[in-house]
Amino acid sequence: MNADELILQALREDITSEDITTNSVMPHDQAGEVDLICKQDGVIAGLEVFKRVFELLDEKTEVVFYCKDGDTVKKGEKIGLVRGDIRVLLSGERTALNYLQRMSGIATYTREIADLLKGTKTKLLDTRKTTPNMRIFEKYSVKVGGGYNHRYNLSDGILLKDNHIGAAGGVKEAVRMAKEYAPFVRKIEIEVENLDMLKDALEAGADIIMLDNMTVEDMKKAVELCRGKAETECSGNVTRENVARLVDIGVDYISSGALTHSSPILDLSLKNLHAI
């Protein structure tokens, strides 16, 4: 499903048959314009999605921006203008803002953590813990904020987690079967919870070791054991407060589901609507 189809689905969810409030008080074909205002500091992401909401309602709608995705914006700043049929402006307002606020919130939170990794080898990754039918938008927002995308979907790579390992009969057996099934160029990543599992994964030839909810001391030992043999990824309970400590340990990647499932929105609004 492409972006336009997802946006149209969101519009149908909100408008259904008609915007009865707007249609009851606004005449047809009355032109107007409204300002896009920031209500808090943050990083903007999703401007083209915001614009597309109005264009899909009426292709004649004009949307002007005074910033671009990835820019830092300030509270009270006017960052855009929407001009067109007032009915369209009112009916599309909520859907357009929902996208822009959600995407900008993810970009803002990602930027806060990514900035803590500047100057280090460690890369910040997202996960598949995304909102249904929002993955394309949420993962884009992570990239805008300075993070990197892990797997976009289940076809993108092999990641053996606890349930895969249990069903396969153990770490070594899971890696062996994955290697037999996967093309040679595909890396095999496996999640481990302790050093014994880690040693089995290395013996089996895993390419990336995900250290899941391990203690700091065990992670230090794990990184040493993996040096020159496999890349390391830290996952689980990643916060702004503990990122520096994880970087010091020397992991190659830090993955965080919180980038997409727990980022607060960036407060934005459409204000000063008037007829023209």
Protein language model features and the residues they cover:
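Acidic/glycine-rich phosphate/pyrophosphate-binding loops and surrounding catalytic core
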Residues: 1-204, 208, 220-225, 230-234, ...
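Short secondary-structure boundary segments
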Residues: 213, 236, 257-258
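Short, charged, intrinsically disordered terminal tails
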Residues: 258-276
